[in-house]
Amino acid sequence: MVSTPELKKYMDKKILLNINGSRKVAGILRGYDIFLNVVLDDAMEINGEDPANNHQLGLQTVIRGNSIISLEALDAI
C-alpha cells in the first residue's frame, strides 16, 4: 500500500524543488498526491544567483513526482 507524503505543513507556502537535470523550481504549493506530483502557483525556474536569469513557468504548474529530488521550504513553517 502506498502512503500519502506528509506535505500538509507546506501547503500554501513557498517551496523550492530540486528536480532532474540540476534544475530548481520555486513556487507556492497548492496540491500534491500519493506519487508526490505537485501543483505550484506562480512557479519560476531558478537559474543561478542572478534573478534576471530566472524564468516564469506559468500561473499554475504541475511537476511530476518522479522528477523531484528534494523539497525545501522558503517560507517559515
UniProtKB/Swiss-Prot annotation:
It is found in: Nucleus; Cytoplasm. GO terms for biological process: 7-methylguanosine cap hypermethylation; mRNA 5'-splice site recognition; mRNA splicing, via spliceosome; spliceosomal complex assembly; spliceosomal snRNP assembly; U2-type prespliceosome assembly. Signal peptide: none annotated. CDD domains: Sm_G. SMART domains: Sm. Keywords: Cytoplasm, mRNA processing, mRNA splicing, Nucleus, Ribonucleoprotein, RNA-binding, Spliceosome. Pfam families: LSM. The keyword Cytoplasm applies. Belongs to the snRNP Sm proteins family. Component of the Sm core complex, present in spliceosomal snRNP U1, U2, U4/U6 and U5. The core complex contains SMB1, SMD1, SMD2, SMD3, SME1, SMX3 and SMX2 (Sm proteins B, D1, D2, D3, E, F and G, respectively), and is probably a heptameric ring structure. SMX2 specifically interacts with SME1. Plays a role in pre-mRNA splicing as a core component of the spliceosomal U1, U2, U4 and U5 small nuclear ribonucleoproteins (snRNPs), the building blocks of the spliceosome. This is Small nuclear ribonucleoprotein G. It comes from Saccharomyces cerevisiae (strain ATCC 204508 / S288c) (Baker's yeast). The gene is SMX2.
